[in-house]
Amino acid sequence: MYMSTDEIREKFLQFFESKGHLRLPSFSLIPKNDKSLLLINAGMAPLKPYFLGIEEPPRRRITTCQKCIRTPDIDKVGKTARHATFFEMLGNFSFGDYFKKEAITWAWEFVTEILKLPKERLWVTIYEEDDEAFEIWHKEVGLEEGRIKRMGKEDNFWEIGTGPCGPCSEIYFDRGVDKGCGKETCGIGCDCDRYVEFWNLVFTQFDKDENGVYHRLKNPNIDTGMGLERIAAIMQGVDSLFDIDIVKAIRDKICEITGCEYGKDSEKDVSIRVITDHIRGTVFMIGDGILPSNEGRGYVLRRLIRRAARHGRMLGKRETFLHLIVDTVIEAYKSPYPELIQKGEYIKKVLYNEESRFNQTIDIGLELLENEIDRLKKNKENVLKGEIAFKLYDTYGFPLDLTREIAAEKGIIVDQAGFDRLMQEQKERARMAQKELENIGWKDINITIEDEVETVFVGYDTLETQSRVLKIFSNDDEVSYAKEGDICYIILDKTPFYAESGGQVADKGVLETEGGVAEVLDVKKGPKGTILHKAKVIKGEIAVDNNIFAKVNKNLRLATMKNHTATHLLHSSLRRILGEHATQSGSLVEPERLRFDFAHFEPLSEEQIVEIEKMVNDIIQQAIPVEKIQTDLDSAIKMGATALFDEKYSNIVRVIKIGDFSMELCGGTHVDNTGQIGMFKIISESSVAAGVRRIEAITGNKVYEFMLNNQKVLKDIRNKLKANSDSEIVAKINQLEERITALEKELEKHKLLLVDNELSLLYNEGLQIGEFRLIINKKETHDTDYIRLLTDRVREKDSKAIVLNLIKQDKKAIVLMACSKEAVKKGIDCGKTVKDVCEVLGGKGGGRPDFAQGGGNKIENLDLAAQRAIELIKSSIEGGS
């Protein structure tokens, strides 16, 4: 009856294709337009819009093998044969088409005729009130009554709050008496390993209302799920999912890397199983564009990687190793998931970087945790403070469940409430900081608006408008007018001025009345739907109730619009070239330039930068219309508009659509046609934080100015080098480099001669202390390289020499001491000597027994410092003799 995992998967999908089902590939682990889920955790999860009637399915019968991640039982992974965070779910689904009869009879047909499982070892459960299912199992399938178990709501009725729900039927396999607990009561539902549930058929036939009343659905649905790993274990006759063919290959690779043999040590086996499970989930998550972070699904990934890394250390693997398993995982899954092959190197890099980062802090964190656990044990306490757990999380990158797991191994529990409190406080601080950065710059102004006033923004359609002054604030107080020279905040009933928001800076321009003119310096969103114009009155006065002409600086706005639309093109290009993980982390759009932060784990290559620039410029040259669509949020998401993960949107949103190249939710201002951007040029690419890169770029006339400046610089270089053409510049530079290298070698020779000459003088003036020669070099110089060279030459020439440099540099003294290992054996300790000598100089110093350095500010004590060194060295040699 043996069947490989790949064979089972393919036979299942082919079987349901033969029953009129459309085979769909596995969906991404990242839920699409479903904020209720962090990660896809069931076969039906990506199909929810079809079940809920929000979207029309491509066919009313669908079959899939869906990759899934579940982490609620992460603490149990490795300790049991069944628990895993990553798994594949086989499923067949009906959206108002067939129902119980087909679902049950086809399931039985597949299990008995395709998998050929012995009928006498199969059992089923049904919901206790589901007589329809009983009749089908008993009369249609022919299963004897004793093998059909009626179970209660807790076991055999699927529902989540209100909405679609229904009874379910589960199929079990009897693994035999020898796998049971031996109790007379052993049967379906027993916690032992004898009866294994492997297929759940859910009959969604009711709609539960808020009063708890069940109404029959007009078009009932079918949702089934069979765990691939679980059925593979049955078909391959093994006791654990870690023993099935594709998982065993990964497990064996881990054993090879760590040098551990599976099955010889129960504690090591747990660690091997943890790594085996977590590396599978990790590979698929990174492959789907998730990057490690401290939030959301990125945090789930970080937990898996760091937990696996810690278990690697428990197996004696202290260096990074997880990336070495990636090829084996891809080899195991390349048939159903060929996309992993091209993503292999990328997955390895992300894994290596994350594990390396954790390795930098894990030892310090483990020491802190172990010391705290020892203290608790000594005091006969068993609760680790939330403050310690939070410090491990915040400072050393320990996910909470990792701390909890390590503590539990020692019989210690973690103060979850204390940890949660500190986490909430940190989130609140971050939320307040973000809030201050967003729309409420007015809070720094300390103004209060009592009346119901509102500013209508008309700046999408026009750059100038007639308006009326509603309020004026000066020095945080409401005033009736502002005179020449005053800086004030003006609220209008309508304005074309864009207020700083979403990374785009505010417009600038002028406000004009019959009696005055004000220059608009900044614009912010204020309270109660107002827009605050920070303005300086440059002529006459501006008064409340004045009719006013508001005029935006056209050139600055146009430059900003070019940069903002270019930012969208850049974002889309990054995701196309680097991968879907390269999502926006922050941005700044201003007239002079644009700045874009995005998720990525390594610097961009020169080739990637050129490719990104070319892609953006190609779209610019195509002069594609830029559509601005106002719609509700749900409609925008259904259109496929990109929404920033952490951004909060109102119900009515603006979609910026650029052909089929880019579509994002955005409230900023944009050009009407990509051709208006002119040109796009990346001027820098750098790191902002771990896993976040930054691109700065320019557009339009700024690119032309950039090119002119570069031409001028190039011309100056050509003239300086006396090159006849630009192409000769590199050759001239190569010649200069060769000449400099030759001169540096010549200089090094002269420096060595000078050092050797000085060394001879110093050696002759040195003190003989026992068998050792103490050479004291007192001089004034800034050439520290020269001093180090002299020191090295002393040690090269004479193993019995001890050298002490006392160097005067401006108003400070530098101490550098070195000796041979032979001198160390005789009692010399440069570290201790330099420490004492530096105290004489009013400073600090130290180092190794054979090399140390330090300094101080009391340069007048250099002679005393030399005398102190002689005393210490004499004492050490004489004491060691």
Curated annotation (Swiss-Prot):
CDD domains: AlaRS_core
InterPro entries tied to this protein: aa-tRNA-synth_II/BPL/LPL (IPR045864), Ala-tRNA-lgiase_IIc (IPR002318), Ala-tRNA-ligase_IIc_anticod-bd (IPR018162), Ala-tRNA-synth_IIc_core (IPR018165), Ala-tRNA-synth_IIc_N (IPR018164), Ala-tRNA_ligase (IPR050058), Ala_tRNA_ligase_euk/bac (IPR023033), DHHA1_dom (IPR003156)
Cofactor note: Binds 1 zinc ion per subunit.
GO cellular component entries: cytosol
Main location: cytoplasm
Protein task: Catalyzes the attachment of alanine to tRNA(Ala) in a two-step reaction: alanine is first activated by ATP to form Ala-AMP and then transferred to the acceptor end of tRNA(Ala). Also edits incorrectly charged Ser-tRNA(Ala) and Gly-tRNA(Ala) via its editing domain.
PANTHER family reported in the protein's UniProt record: ALANINE--TRNA LIGASE, CYTOPLASMIC, ALANYL-TRNA SYNTHETASE
Free-text note regarding domains: Consists of three domains; the N-terminal catalytic domain, the editing domain and the C-terminal C-Ala domain. The editing domain removes incorrectly charged amino acids, while the C-Ala domain, along with tRNA(Ala), serves as a bridge to cooperatively bring together the editing and aminoacylation centers thus stimulating deacylation of misacylated tRNAs.
Protein name: Alanine--tRNA ligase
Organism of derivation: Caldicellulosiruptor saccharolyticus (strain ATCC 43494 / DSM 8903 / Tp8T 6331)
